[in-house]
């Protein structure tokens, strides 16, 4: 963690599924002076964050299975965003909701409508005829 901080990192993201002691890792990151995000894979329930949600700055919901670009958006992610937004509201957490995978203009609009704050749009941008225009259109969601 120290080495990452020393590189100038402002936020460190850890996968829920990769941490045996998530709370300890979150606290170590915060103690190092960085913000912290926790990532959930598509099959991991939002409920797994109940005990940690007040301690994190952002939650990244994967809307495809990690590994390679160009996958189709997993539709039940919309329900997960709604559930996470409710958890954040009910606990007084200030965490942002980020979604990565299969994000384009259509899915991006749906995600923003159900409560997403941050969108990661790889192929929608890099395969667009005009990347600048696509970025502008995504930002306007």
Regions found by a protein language model. Give the residues of each.
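Hydrophobic residues in well-ordered beta-strands that form the structural core
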Residues: 38, 99, 120-121, 127
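Short loop/turn elements that flank and shape the SAM/SAH-binding pocket of Class I
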Residues: 46, 105-106
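Expand to "…catalyze enediolate/carbanion chemistry for C-C bond making/breaking, isomerization
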Residues: 20, 24, 34, 104, ...
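C-terminal helical cap(s) of enzyme catalytic domains, especially alpha/beta-barrels
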Residues: 29, 112, 124-141
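Short Gly/Pro-enriched loop/turn and capping motifs at secondary-structure junctions
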Residues: 65-67, 102-105, 125-126
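A short alpha/beta connector and helix-capping loop motif
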Residues: 7, 108-125
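Conserved anion-binding
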Residues: 1-96
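Conserved, mostly hydrophobic/aromatic
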Residues: 4, 59, 84, 100, ...
């Amino acid at each position: 963690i120290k080495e990452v901080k020393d590189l100038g990192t402002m936020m460190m993201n850890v996968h829920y599924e990769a941490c045996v002691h998530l709370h300890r890792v979150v606290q170590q990151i915060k103690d190092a002076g960085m913000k912290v995000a926790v990532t959930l894979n598509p099959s991991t329930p939002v409920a797994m964050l109940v005990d940690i949600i007040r301690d994190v700055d952002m939650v990244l919901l994967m809307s495809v299975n990690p590994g390679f670009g160009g996958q189709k958006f997993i539709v039940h992610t919309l329900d997960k965003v709604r559930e996470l937004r409710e958890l954040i509201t009910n606990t007084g957490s200030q965490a942002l909701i980020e979604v990565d995978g299969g994000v384009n203009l259509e899915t991006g609009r749906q995600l923003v409508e159900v409560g997403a704050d941050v969108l990661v749009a790889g192929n929608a941008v890099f395969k667009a005829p005009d990347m600048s225009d696509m970025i502008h259109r995504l930002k306007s969601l």
